[in-house]
Amino acid sequence: MQPKDLVQLAEQFGSPLYVYDAAKIQSQYQRLTKAFSKVEKLRINYAMKALSNVAILELLRDMGSCLDAVSIQEVQLGLHAGYSPDQIFFTPNGVSLEEIEEVSALGVQINIDNLSILEQFGTKYPTVPVCIRINPHVMAGGNTNISVGHIDSKFGISIHQLPHLLRIVENTKMHIVGIHMHTGSDILDIEVFLYAAEILFDVAKNFKELEFLDFGSGFKVPYKKDDIETDIEELGKKLSKRFNSFCAEYGKDLTLIFEPGKFLVSEAGY
């Protein structure tokens, strides 16, 4: 997108005007999928809280992306944009059981991040497929304000509560199909991310009917010239190898999920 293009668009549509570069979004999406091309099953859930413009959602849908939603309003917007319920993940924080029930009734995958709701939902709906969000207590984001995997974070069930979590799952006989984590935004050190991934793998070993592992996102993009960014290619190389190795140990090809938001869209806006 060149300055002259922006001037022409402003003259055509008037100003102020929001312009998004579809080619940039597409190149970022392809960069991520290429980095993990050695993984048999890869799914991208666009974190729509980054930019929920319906035209952007439709663009990503046509590329093959799915969605990560944090509220029932985002779920409804995703459905409006043409996504099917099975293409949407619901990852709320601090919402009521009633809202989770309402979203689940739509056929959307539920991701639960606290023990109280997990027990209540599992008791009422033991056969409904559920993903569990854990907190690995690893701070991989740029600072504590945008890191959500550290010990004081409100996001996710602490790994120190794993025995309690397992008791709930055993007592309710609920159907756990996925394990999820999200360490934070602006990840610089991929070794820290890989360390958190090992914690996720260890937790996953406790569940025998998993279908996917969700590693969140938080990939840093450059905000200015020569700014540092997450080395997606190196992360793809290392995590793909370890993920494939884990699947072999687990005895099943699981789906690897990422939920990028600003990685896909933050460099595309004008």
Residue ranges and their predicted role:
Residues L188-Y270:
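C-terminal active-site-proximal or functional interface alpha/beta core segments in diverse enzymes
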Residues L57, H80, I100-E102, G122-Y125, ...:
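Short acidic, glycine/serine/threonine-rich loops at helix termini
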